[in-house]
Every structure is written in structure tokens, then in C-alpha cells.
């Protein structure tokens, strides 16, 4: 809150906004809840993206599509931010006017998928093959590694991250997990 009020006092609304968003992300990260609804996860993701858009003004746009039918799905908390962070840091790679897209849907087997894609240069072929066969290593891709480990820990070896290059350009990282709806609360 101190940073937020310093930003307000000095007429720098970006500092105030970043402090508020960061505080919300930190509160969620220290919460004992292991699972959240997709809606809650997307709210935190929007806060993270807001911070990054202040950090990299005008450098990228983002879209989120397909999420409406799945907003009540239960997912491990804080699994989307590392995927988007990876797309921003590696996919945009000092480019101007990049795009990051988050797409939510259902596989043919009834599983939930959440894809994060960018329009950068894609994954080098050797890295793509390594990621597809054994997943990301903890050396240099710690966020992707952690998300993959979390998904496999909770759901088993059939679930986790999938890696591909886009049809025209960019990388696509997809989290695949069982479709689990949250129980309604009264």
C-alpha cells in the first residue's frame, strides 16, 4: 500500500497501478488455496499483463478467447502467469507490436486446455524436440518446468504442457488438464 500511495502523491498513476496489481498477485501466491477457478486465474493474469504493459508500453497486445464456458473450472493456481511471462520474454524478444493470445477450450477427450501463443520466431527445432519428448528442463525455463511438474503431480503423466510452433510463426504452449468444475457455494 505504501508504494501505491507514493505513486498517487507524486502523480504517477502507473506506480500506484503496478503496486496494487503486484500486491494482489503476491496475496494469491501466499494463499493456502492450491486450486482456483479459471475466472480467478484469469483475473490474476490480467493483473500480471497490466504490469507488463506498463513495463513494455505499446510493445504487445493480448487477447483471451474461448474462456466463457470454462470460467468455473478448477485449476491449480498461478499456472498461467509463467506461460505468458515466457511468451513475453522469449516470444516477443525485443520486438515491437507483438501479440500474445490465450485460448481456452476442450479437447476431443473432454479435457480442458489453455493455450498461450505468441507471434515471435517460435521455438528452435532442437528445443522444440527436447520439450516435446521430455518437457522443459529446470535450466533456463524454470517457470515452464514448474507448471509442467505441478500439472503432472496433480493429474498424472497424461497431463501437463504441450509445445508446438504456430502454423505461420510463434510458439504455442498448451496446458492440458482434466475438466473439473468447481462445486457451487451457497
Feature-to-residue mapping (PLM):
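Small/flexible residues
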Residues: 163, 183-184
Amino acid at each position: 500500500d505504501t508504494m501505491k500511495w507514493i505513486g498517487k502523491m507524486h502523480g504517477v498513476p502507473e506506480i500506484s497501478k503496478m503496486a496494487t496489481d503486484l500486491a494482489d498477485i503476491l496475496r494469491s501466491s501466499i494463499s493456502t488455496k492450491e486450486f482456483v477457478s479459471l475466472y480467478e486465474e484469469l483475473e490474476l493474469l490480467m493483473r500480471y499483463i497490466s504490469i507488463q504493459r506498463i513495463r513494455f508500453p505499446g510493445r504487445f497486445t493480448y487477447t483471451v478467447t474461448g474462456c466463457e464456458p470454462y470460467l468455473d473450472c478448477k485449476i491449480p493456481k498461478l499456472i498461467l502467469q509463467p506461460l505468458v511471462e515466457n511468451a513475453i520474454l522469449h516470444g516477443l524478444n525485443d520486438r515491437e507490436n507483438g501479440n500474445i493470445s490465450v485460448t481456452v477450450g476442450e479437447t476431443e477427450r473432454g479435457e480442458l486446455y489453455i493455450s498461450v501463443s505468441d507471434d515471435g520466431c517460435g521455438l528452435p527445432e532442437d528445443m522444440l524436440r527436447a520439450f516435446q519428448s521430455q518437457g522443459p528442463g529446470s535450466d533456463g525455463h524454470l517457470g515452464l518446468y514448474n507448471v509442467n511438474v505441478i500439472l503432472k503431480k496433480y493429474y498424472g503423466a497424461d497431463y501437463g504442457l504441450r509445445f508446438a510452433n504456430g502454423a505461420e510463426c510463434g510458439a504455442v504452449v498448451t496446458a492440458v488438464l482434466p475438466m473439473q468444475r468447481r462445486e457451487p457455494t451457497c
